[in-house]
Amino acid sequence: MEQTADQPVTGQVAEAMTAEHESLSLECRADPARFERLLAPDFHEFGASGGEIGYPGTAAQVAAATDPEGEPIRVENMRGWLLADGLVMLKYTSEIQGRRANRTSLWRRTASGRWQIFHHQGTITAR
């Protein structure tokens, strides 16, 4: 069942959305250790260039590209689906320094109950 930010979001979808928003906060992105805790060991991303990025070095790359005093990442139309117990897909549009992208993330709950992202894709879109 789809849950959106315009409606009451509950349960695991709400937990995954909280984790996604954390991963997008400048404070988290500027802190490699904090950001890395949100990444699953098998994390991979298809970036805007079409290249695939894996877990090693991702947190350091994100931190190096983040200005903690910069403009926050804007998020629009976030919605989520509980695919299975402990597995959530999120879709939304982001805007970073005037660049918009459609994004999809897959989040998995660990045995300890923490949420980690294991797949992300961002596709640049026209305004």
Locate predicted features.
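Juxtamembrane and targeting peptides
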Residues: 1-7
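Short beta-strand edge/turn micro-motifs at domain boundaries
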Residues: 100-127
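A solvent-exposed, acidic/Ser-Thr-rich amphipathic alpha-helical stretch
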Residues: 13-14, 26-86
